[in-house]
Amino acid sequence: MTERPRDCRPVVRRARTSDVPAIKQLVDTYAGKILLEKNLVTLYEAVQEFWVAEHPDLYGKVVGCGALHVLWSDLGEIRTVAVDPAMTGHGIGHAIVDRLLQVARDLQLQRVFVLTFETEFFARHGFTEIEGTPVTAEVFDEMCRSYDIGVAEFLDLSYVKPNILGNSRMLLVL
């Protein structure tokens, strides 16, 4: 008798508050290298933006995460994509980004931005490198009112320059 191969694709679902400690652990794995450190309160405040991946063979263990943050009426940002290092190469990051892009489409966003070191990864999803900040002067001025550090990074404000050195700015038109 031949055993059917198991479907080992990750299950990607909305994050719950109970997932925040696992998200924090994933982020901490990459903090200071390719992701900014995030404290627990910041993650709890943004939990509604996060999606997590569970691997079916690991009894619901969170093995990846990512968030979609709306920046403006037509523009979102994918941020904080992280995969358990033991699980890289299994399509988990791609599954998360695919889900986040679907959410962006559902929200009727027209463009999605990412600030990343992982240019090849995001290029496989159709992102292209850009220069500057792809918003009008009026929108730029309004966005400067945000307290979100990620928005400041998107705007390339001088006080966040140390956070973004070496990152590439990429954009996908949906």
Curated annotation (Swiss-Prot):
Catalytic activities: L-glutamate + acetyl-CoA = N-acetyl-L-glutamate + CoA + H(+)
Keywords tagged on the record: Acyltransferase, Amino-acid biosynthesis, Arginine biosynthesis, Transferase
Biological processes, Gene Ontology terms: arginine biosynthetic process via ornithine; L-arginine biosynthetic process; protein homotetramerization
Tree of life domain: Bacteria
Cystine crosslinks: none
Note, other: Was identified as a high-confidence drug target.
Family the UniProt entry places it in: Belongs to the acetyltransferase family.
Designated name of the protein: Amino-acid acetyltransferase
Organism: Mycobacterium tuberculosis (strain ATCC 25618 / H37Rv)
